Amino acid sequence: MGDALSDADLQLALYCCYELHYRGLAGVNPDWKWDRALLSFRGEIEHAFLDRLRDETGPFACHSLGDIGSALGELIASASGPSLSNFLLESGSLSQIQEFCVHRSAYQRKVADRHTIAVPSLSGDAEVAMAEIQFDDYGRSSAVGRRSTLFADTMTALGLDSAYGAYLDELPGPTLATVNLVSMFGLHRRWRAALVGHLATFEMSSIAPVERYSRALAHLGTGRGGNRFDDVQVAGNPGDGAIARDRLVAAAVETEPHLRDDLLFGAAAVLLVEERFARHLLDAWSVGRSSLVPPGLDLCAALGRHNLDGLDPSPSGFGRGASGPENRS
C-alpha cells in the first residue's frame, strides 16, 4: 500500500465504497451498501487514511485556549500551502482551468450531500445552523440555483462533460482524498465534530479564492453561465461563513465540549488535503504535464491490489466503462 493520502488505487476504491451511499454504481446491487465484507474492506482503508491524517496534522494544544471560533480562525490563518486560485488568475491557461474543473467535479457535482448526511448526528442550534448552510447549497428551494447545478453549467461553458461522474477515471489520489475525507467524516457519527470543522473551514476561508476563480473564468470569456457558480458562492459565503463561525462551531462545542479537538482535527485535515491537492496540480503544470491520471487505472485492479476477500467485483460493473447515470461521481 502506498501513501494513503495520495495512493490512486486506495482512494479510488474508497470512493466507490462511499458512492454506494449516494447515487450508487451501475450494475452493483444496492444491498452491497451494507455488505459486511465490503464494510470491513472499507474500514481497513479508512484506518490507513485516518492514521496518515493524524500523522500529518499533529496535536492541537496550541489551539486549545479561547473560544472555538477564534481557535478555528487561527488554524485557518496558519495554513501555508500554495495558492491555486492565484496561479489560475495570474497565469492559468484554458486547458489548466478545464483540468481544475475536472478535478473539482467529483466534489462540486454532489456538493452539500456529504455534509447533509450528518445533520441528524447533531443537535440544537448546531443542527439548525448546519441545515441553514446546506439550504443555500441546495439553491434555497430552486433546483436551478443548486450549487451542483451551477457547477455543471460552468463545466458546460468550458466545453466539458457535466454528467455526474464523467471524469472519475481521470482523477488522481490527492483529488479523490478531498472528496473521501468529507464522506468519511459524514458517514461516521464518531466524526460528527470533524465534519463540522470541515464545513466551517470551507465556509470561512473560501470567499477570496472563489472570487479569483470567477475572475479567471471571466478573463477567458466564458460568459455568465461560466462563472455564475463562483459568483453565487461569493455572494452567499459571507453569511454562511458567519453562521459557521458564530453558531455552528460554537453550538457544536457547547453541546459536546469533549469533541473540541475532533472539530479542530476536521479543520486541519481539510487544510492538509487541499494543500496536497493544490501542490499536485501546480507540480504537474510546472513541468508541462497534465495533472490528471493517464488512461489505464481501473477499480477492478484497485480492488485486487487491496485484497478484497469475499467479493467478486468484476460482474457487478465496478470497472472502467460501467455505464449509466449512477456509475461515477
State each model region's role.
Residues 1-329:
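Non-heme di-metal
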